[in-house]
């Protein structure tokens, strides 16, 4: 190849004109470089030569190329300095406000540089950097976020059914621009937030729906309104769902719900007949956009989970079964009446959708338990005189007029009542009256009430009355000098022994009529000396009986103290008789001596 300088031989005549020499040399240089570029095109073919005009950095249009402008054009076409990336990064997808403002190019749109393209090959030197044609630009890598078609395949059917009121412009844009829907799926804000994708929707969204059929005025077509019932689940803490509900606004679903808002009261469906409650289970009836992820449609949430049935609310008034079916209310239930009543209550019972307690029986009648008015008394109360005679001391109705004191549970009688008992005033109630003098022996011998017996120890009282209990009606009256300590103590011991011996037939006692004379012998002697034998009164602290009183009182206190702390052994007879078994639950010989 000839040197470029050899071409200057024909310019001898034009040596003085520099403005002609320089363009000619530049043209020759471009011709030599064009031959070298043809060899590079064999290894790096280009599909299309893009011709454009260059702009001078100073704003002047250049008819010829310059090295500075060629370098700037190549860098702008290969590196794309001033353009944002076509696909949003994963961090940008978390902020819908940023990803929505970015103008996303379509797949079939040619990427145009803001700078003018390089001129044609006949005027510029091409770059040696390999670059694919812009007209065949396509996306082959996977998206960093989940595709809208996959999210749509897992969207609940109730949420898809609510999108029937979308505008035609939204539908056309969804079908035409598949790449735009791939990046930015349509999200609308509604009451139930059912249009959000599964990974952006809160947990309170519904997974089932109810079709409410309402006939038109002319009997024409039937409108199908699908309402999504929100479940009682906790709200999700997904930040993306909150951002989407705040950034997007779609009032189509709100208008659909507001037309029939009166059918919902406090979160419950009202006036829904049983025939109109249907579950949306037919996947073919729901229109879904065409997508390449058809295999995911078979694994929707409605196919994996089954919605709980909802029983319709009966608007008819409750019928009183006692009025409508008087034959069911019977006094003594029979098998047939019980079966009819059970079927009627089982059919008409209100079974709630959610119950905290699960039981095998819904009412007490199914357990065989009847109401209080239907109960039959199988053990009637005995009203015979014998049953009223032997009663407990705690609820006893004694025959003599008496009164109670706070010191103990035994009843007190007055002196006049005792005189009437001695005179036979109560002979129609009692067969015999026994007066027990609990004073010491020297006191009794000094003076006592007529017909009274002296028993001043516990063992003596038990041997006298409980070894061989009397079978006739007897009234026992205890007294001492003042009836404050010795008489009440011995009388309580006698009552406790009688109760223990009759524990197998409680509340019956051998001697239910036990009284204490109020005021004791001293008061009785002062008022009724003629009823004393001998007519005398010897006090317990008499000077002539000091030693005897001290010894007797020590024995009385010792027995009382030991009996409180002494352990009881079966076989040890408290009656001092080998013929009596003192076990409280044994059927001993004393149990045969009953008063009937």
From Swiss-Prot:
Catalytic activity: O-phospho-L-tyrosyl-[protein] + H2O = L-tyrosyl-[protein] + phosphate
GO cellular component, as recorded: cytoplasm; cytosol; nucleus
Keywords of this entry: Cell cycle, Cell division, Cytoplasm, Hydrolase, Mitosis, Nucleus, Phosphoprotein, Protein phosphatase
Subunit structure: Interacts with rad24 during G2 in a srk1-dependent manner; the interaction is increased during osmostress.
Coiled coil: none
Species assigned in the record: Schizosaccharomyces pombe (strain 972 / ATCC 24843)
PTM comment: Phosphorylated by srk1 in the N-terminus; phosphorylation promotes nuclear exclusion.
GO MF annotations, alphabetized: phosphoprotein phosphatase activity; protein tyrosine phosphatase activity
Record-given protein name: M-phase inducer phosphatase
Domain (Rhodanese): residue spans on this chain: 429-533
Catalytic residues (positions): 480 (phosphocysteine intermediate)
């Amino acid at each position: 190849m000839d040197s470029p300088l050899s071409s200057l031989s024909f310019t001898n005549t034009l040596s003085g004109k520099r403005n002609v020499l320089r363009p000619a040399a530049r043209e020759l240089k471009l011709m030599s470089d064009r031959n070298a570029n043809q060899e590079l095109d064999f290894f790096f073919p280009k599909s299309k030569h893009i011709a454009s005009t260059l702009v001078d950095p100073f704003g002047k249009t250049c008819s010829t190329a310059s090295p500075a402008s060629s370098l700037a054009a190549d860098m702008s076409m290969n590196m794309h300095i001033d353009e944002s990336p076509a696909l949003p990064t994963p961090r940008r997808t978390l902020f819908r406000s940023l990803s929505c403002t970015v103008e996303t190019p379509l797949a079939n749109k040619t990427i145009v540089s803001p700078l003018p393209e390089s001129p044609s090959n006949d005027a510029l030197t091409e770059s040696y950097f390999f670059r694919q044609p812009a007209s065949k630009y396509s996306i082959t890598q996977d998206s960093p976020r989940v595709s809208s078609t996959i999210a749509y395949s897992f969207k609940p059917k109730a949420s898809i059914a609510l999108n029937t009121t979308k505008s035609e412009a939204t539908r056309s844009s969804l079908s035409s621009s598949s790449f735009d829907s791939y990046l930015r799926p349509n999200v609308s804000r509604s009451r139930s937030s059912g249009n959000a994708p599964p990974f952006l929707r809160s947990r309170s969204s519904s997974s089932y729906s109810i079709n409410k059929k309402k006939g038109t005025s002319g009997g024409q077509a039937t409108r199908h309104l699908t309402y999504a019932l929100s479940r009682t689940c906790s709200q999700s803490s997904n930040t993306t769902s909150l951002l989407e509900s705040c950034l997007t606004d779609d009032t189509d679903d709100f208008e659909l719900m507001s037309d029939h808002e009166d059918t919902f009261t406090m979160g419950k469906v009202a006036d829904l007949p049983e025939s109109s409650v249907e579950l949306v289970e037919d996947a073919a009836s729901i229109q879904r956009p065409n997508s390449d992820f058809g295999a995911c449609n078979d694994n929707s949430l409605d196919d994996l989970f089954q919605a709980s049935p909802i029983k319709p609310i009966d608007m008819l008034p409750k019928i009183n079964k006692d009025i409508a079916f008087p034959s069911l209310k019977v006094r003594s239930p029979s098998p047939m009446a019980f079966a009819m009543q059970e079927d009627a209550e089982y059919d008409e019972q209100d079974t709630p959708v959610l119950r905290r307690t699960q039981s095998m029986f819904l009412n007490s009648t199914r357990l065989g338990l009847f109401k209080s008015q239907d109960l039959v008394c199988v053990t009637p109360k005995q009203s015979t005189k014998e049953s009223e005679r032997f009663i407990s001391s705690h609820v006893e109705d004694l025959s003599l007029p008496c009164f109670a004191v706070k010191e103990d549970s035994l009843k007190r009688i007055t002196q006049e009542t005792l005189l009437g008992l001695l005179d036979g005033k109560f002979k129609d109630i009692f067969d015999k009256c026994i007066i027990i003098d609990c004073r010491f022996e020297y006191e009794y011998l000094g003076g006592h009430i007529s017909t009274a017996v002296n028993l001043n120890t516990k063992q003596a009282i038990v041997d006298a009355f409980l070894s061989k209990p009397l079978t006739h009606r007897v009234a026992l009256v205890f007294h001492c000098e003042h009836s404050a300590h010795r008489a009440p103590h011995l009388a309580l011991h006698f009552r406790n022994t009688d109760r223990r011996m009759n524990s197998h037939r409680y509340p019956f006692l051998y001697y239910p009529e036990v009284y204490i004379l109020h005021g004791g012998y001293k008061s009785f002697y002062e008022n009724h000396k003629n009823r004393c034998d001998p007519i005398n009164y010897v006090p317990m602290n008499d000077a002539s009986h000091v030693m005897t009183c001290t010894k007797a009182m020590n024995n009385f206190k010792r027995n009382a103290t030991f009996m409180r702390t002494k352990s009881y052994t079966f076989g040890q007879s408290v009656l001092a008789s080998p013929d009596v078994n003192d076990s409280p639950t044994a059927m001993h010989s004393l149990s045969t001596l009953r008063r009937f």
